[in-house]
Amino acid sequence: MRITALAGGVGGARFLRGLLAAAPEAAVTVIGNVGDDMTMHGLRICPDLDTVMYTLGGGIHEGQGWGRVDETFGVADELKAYGVGPDWFTLGDKDIATHLVRTQMMGAGYPLSAVTEALCTRWELPVRLLPSTDERVETHVVIDDPEAPGGRRAVHFQEYWVRMHAPDARAIVSVGVEGAKPAPGVLEAIAEADVIVLPPSNPVVSIGTILDIPGIRQAVADAPAPVVGVGSTHGTSSGSTRRTSDRSQVTSPPARSVMVTVSPLNATRDADITRPLERTTRSARAGAARASPARTASATSRVGKVISLYFGSTNAWNTLTPNSLKS
């Protein structure tokens, strides 16, 4: 059986580990989110891809769900002594080695997909891990800021989540997505899958940002395979965690799930999921305050398919309303 999963970080990685235990003979391809990617201290960091890699490769810090087990922080301590920031995102020494290799290879001209394949070779992953795109696409969040022009400004999702602890969001911005295309192998993995799985990753900033890459949403909609979403049940999940400057972890509230039965593509009323949060894909230079409303990302499917989408209960996306499932 060929299984293709669209996955974010912690939730997706843990689901994949269970999937492999349940279906050890399956050929699994994972299409990973790159929206969390960023450059810090000159290093290209891919949090979600690395979390999947470390988890399935046996190197993850199990208690946190991210970062390396038995990590040390000598470099971070030295940077702090020099007064070099930012101090809200701590990189471990082992983790830095991964980022050094990635940055060096990308600087030499290798695309992210080739770099990811090379990094995964070391970990002997039981899956094929693909970035959703080789292009640089980052998720930014528009927040209120009385001191900014127009009263709003956009920050990188990692800063929004880790440093600012997820204040009310006004828009989700996929910066650079207009010029992006699926990484090699992504569309083929979707078209050739026997099952397409949406793990319990955040539907807005993990699954949604993958579907935002031009061509991926339509490929999922056109795929002959069933599309199955797996979500947490309200009150049973401990929520997701985020790193802090003091290396402790902050846990978000429990999650809830919404089950949606998808109608035929040619029905008079397909199904989609909307939310009271603007979503926009535009360049970084556009005015953040002019972000236009758009529907949240979700795949269109055929009759008889059931999708249970995971909805995190953090501020901006905890009031999603199930209506229909049409992009």
Regions found by a protein language model. Give the residues of each.
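Charged helix-capping and loop-helix junction motifs
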Residues: I210-R217
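A short helix->loop->beta-strand "cap" motif at the edges of active sites that frequently abuts
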Residues: P24-A26, A223-V227
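Low-acidity, Ser/Thr- and Arg-rich intrinsically disordered low-complexity segments
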Residues: S240-S257, T261-R269, T274-R275, R279-R302, ...
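Electropositive, gly/pro-rich neighborhoods at or near active sites that engage anionic ligands
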Residues: N33-S174
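Short glycine/serine/threonine-rich phosphate/pyrophosphate-binding segments
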Residues: G11-L16, V205-I210
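A short, Lys/Arg-enriched amphipathic alpha-helix followed by its capping loop at the start of a domain
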Residues: F15-A26
